UniProtKB/Swiss-Prot annotation:
Name of this chain's protein: Ribonuclease PH
One Gene Ontology term from the biological process aspect of the record: rRNA processing
GO molecular function terms attached to this record: 3'-5'-RNA exonuclease activity; tRNA binding; tRNA nucleotidyltransferase activity
Domain of life: Bacteria
Length: 238
């Protein structure tokens, strides 16, 4: 039996709270069960040097975890003087995923930075970050359309992300920490609304997985992402 007696294809309760902070152009608190991430979007009327004069915009992301977001206190990366490899990998994943949902030429020569700060971690922080940052990005871009800065909305699709894995030989969706730490296979899937995949990150931590198991995990991820898209749409409709 899974924690909280969830079905194998059932994500944790998902909640998206928009306009969570007052200064950012977009801000969201996203919750997947006990995992909670604050996602904020900042618009700047400039682009990185390598894009100057290219008539296109840029979307990037930063990711971090509060020291006591985990069971025991983590040292702040700022105190260490550098970001860890895991942090860099995750923020690049978030940025790639969000760029896929935006027509960067239609965005014009401006940048949007998504800051994803984990305030409580119980597994799936990177997938929760992508899911929440997507909504924060939509709000930031909607503001640019509303104030006349943009004539056309450059959003092509929502994006959602979810973890899937094999725990005790059983494929399951949206792993929390106790499942993730015991999983034989762990996979993160990022998806567009039409079902196309932006990223699939999968690793056999124990026994290698079969082609059939891979297809089962991808089907679980697609089903889970469709539920997430419904939550995102409902949040954006409020």
């Amino acid at each position: 039996m899974r924690p909280n007696e969830r079905a194998n294809n059932q994500p944790r309760p998902i909640k998206i709270t928009r306009h969570y902070t007052k200064h950012a152009e977009g801000s969201v608190l996203v919750e997947f069960g006990d995992t909670k991430v604050l996602c904020t979007a900042t618009v700047e009327e400039s682009v990185p040097r390598f894009l100057k004069g290219q008539n296109q915009g840029w979307v990037t992301a930063e990711y971090g975890m509060l020291p006591r977001s985990t069971h025991s206190r983590m040292q702040r990366e700022a105190a260490k003087g550098k970001q860890g490899g895991r942090t860099l990998e995750i923020q690049r994943l978030i940025a790639r995923s969000l760029r896929a949902m935006v027509d960067l030429e239609a965005l014009g020569e401006r940048s949007i930075t998504l800051d994803c700060d984990v305030i409580q971690a119980d597994g799936g922080t990177r997938t929760a970050s992508i899911t929440g940052a997507c909504v924060a990005l939509c709000d930031a871009i909607h503001g640019l359309v509303e104030n006349g800065t943009l004539k056309v909305n450059p959003i092509k699709s929502l994006v959602a992300a979810i973890s899937v894995g094999i725990v005790e030989g059983v494929p399951v969706c949206d792993l929390e920490y106790v499942e993730d730490s015991a999983a034989e296979t762990d996979m993160n899937v990022v998806m567009m609304e039409d079902g196309r995949m932006i990223e699939v990150q999968g690793t056999a931590e124990g026994e290698p997985f079969s082609h059939e198991e891979l297809l089962t995990l991808l089907a679980l991820a697609k089903e889970g992402c469709q539920l997430i898209f419904d939550v995102q749409r409902q949040a954006l409709a409020k």
